[in-house]
Amino acid sequence: MAPPPAMKPASRKRGPPAPDPVELPPPGFVADRAEAAARVERLLRYQFRDGRLLEEALTHQSFADDAVSYQRLEFVGDSALGLAFSNFLYLTNPTLGPGPLSTLRAANISTEKLARVAVRHDLYPLLRRNCPRLDLLVGQFIETVKQEPEDDLSTVPYGGSVVKAPKVLADIVEAIAAAVYVDCKFDLEKLWKVTRWLFEPIITAETIDEQPVTMLHELCQKHGKMAQFKTWQKGGMTVVNVFVAGELVGIGSSEQKVIAKLNAARDATRKLAGAKKQVLTTGVGNGLGDEIGELRECKQKLNEQCSRQNWPKPIFK
C-alpha cells in the first residue's frame, strides 16, 4: 500500500502590502507657495517685482540642501532695519542723545521684539523648513506670547516671562524686510513706508524700561545695598532667588536661566518699591551702608576716569 502523500503546510493568507509612511507637513505649514507669497504681499500691501526674493526670504536652511535660504537676506535686513529705525528715532526725538537713541533702536530691533512681530502676523507657517525641534520651540513661544498683555512693552526688549524668543522668528522678519529693500532697489524710505506699521507699537522713550537686572542693581546702590542672585534647579526649571541685606526679596523661574534671572529681578524691583521697601531703608543702609554706597560710587568714577585716560585699572585693597 502506497504511503499517503505528504501534507503541505497551510499557507498563510497575506493581506495587501502596508502603505508607505506618509510624511505630513509640519503643523500650520502653508504648502501652497503661491498662497504663502500672496499672504506676505497682502500683509505688506506691496507687490514684489522679483518673486524669487520673497521665496528666498521664506526658506530656512534646514529645508533642502539645494534651496537658497534666507541667511543672506537676513544679514542685509538686520542692517537695513537698524538704519531705518536710526533715521526714524533721530527725527522724532530731537532732544535725545546718542546713548538713549541707541537704546531705543536696540529695543525695537531686538530678537524679542521682532519675534513677537512674526507671531502677531503669523509668519512662521509661511516658512519652508524641515526641523521638528524648531517647530516645537516656536510653538511653545507662540503659546507664551498669547498670554502676554498686548499693551505691555516693558518686558519685550529683554525677554518675556517664560521662554526666550527663538531667533528664527526674528530672522523671518529681517529677511522679508531685506527682500523688500532689495526689490525696491535699496530705497530705504520705501522700505520704511512698507514695513513700519509691522513694528507697531514702536517702543519709545516713554514706554521703555531699563534692563531689569541693571535697574535692580541701581536701585540697591542708591541705598548702599547689594543684590545677590542665588540659582538652583527644581525639576526641569531654573529658579533664581534675589537677596538684599540677607532678606529674600524676589523669585523667578523658567526653563532658561537668563529668563529666570530677569523674572527674579523684575519681582525684586516691584517688591522693593512696595511691600519690601523697608529692606532698602533699614539696617546697614542707615549708616555703614550709606558709606559703602558712596565708596562704591567713588570707585566707579575712578574706574571711568582711568578708562577715559587709558590709565592702568586701579587695584582696591
Swiss-Prot record:
Domain RNase III stretches: 37-185
Cofactor(s) listed in the protein's UniProt record: Mg(2+); Mn(2+)
UniProt region (Disordered), positions on chain: 1-26
EC number: 3.1.26.-
Residues passing through the membrane, by range: none
A GO term for molecular function: ribonuclease III activity
GO CC terms in record: cytoplasm; nucleus
The DRBM domain, residue ranges: 211-274
InterPro entries for this protein: dsRBD_dom, RNase_III_dom, RNase_III_sf
Residue numbers binding Mg(2+): E74, D171, E174
Site annotation Important for activity: residues: K167
Function noted in UniProt: Cleaves double-stranded RNA (dsRNA).
The protein's name in its UniProt record: Ribonuclease 3-like protein 2
